Design a protein with these regions (language model features):
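Metal-dependent phosphoester-hydrolase catalytic domains
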Residues: 26-47, 52-142
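Catalytic-adjacent loop/helix segments of enzymes that bind and process anionic phosphate/sulfate esters
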Residues: 1-38
Length: 142
């Protein structure tokens, strides 16, 4: 009886965790769709930086960057100039980089994305003891 009760508690806890993660993924996807539209409507060079809490393979990352054709509703509207944003790490970073300190230093979930007109010259993420994320620094040529 005790084993059955413990198993049921563990199952409920796991389902609650999964529901919470799903809700967070859904919220971030909606925010990415809104940001994509703002970027698409802007006639100016764009710089987007922040804690996306999403991997480089995620819907959020690719939507904000402009890699995905359309949002989750199927709307297809790209940047007015037809440009995708570039990932500063890919344009001027070196080697392997993580920004989330836990999970064995495997996750890069903080980004600086920029229009091709903006030129990055250096990109790094120094160790930082004040947060569970390391900051991201990108130098640019103006």
């Amino acid at each position: 009886e005790l084993y059955k009760e413990d198993t049921q508690k563990a199952e409920r806890a796991a389902l609650t965790l999964i529901d919470g993660l799903h809700e967070n993924f859904r919220k971030r996807a909606g925010q990415a769709d809104v940001l994509k539209q703002l970027i698409a409507d802007s006639p100016y060079p764009t710089l987007v930086c922040g804690d996306f809490n999403s991997l480089p393979s995620s819907y959020v990352y690719h939507t904000i960057k402009g890699d995905k054709k359309g949002d989750k509703k199927g709307n297809k509207k790209g940047n007015k100039k037809g440009n995708k944003l570039q990932d500063g790490f890919q344009t001027s970073g070196h080697g392997y980089m993580y920004t989330f300190k836990f999970f064995k230093h495997l996750l890069r979930i903080d980004y600086v994305l920029h229009s091709p007109e903006l030129k990055s010259t250096d990109y790094f993420s120094p160790d930082w003891s004040y947060s569970d994320h390391n900051p991201v620094v990108m130098r640019m040529k103006l």
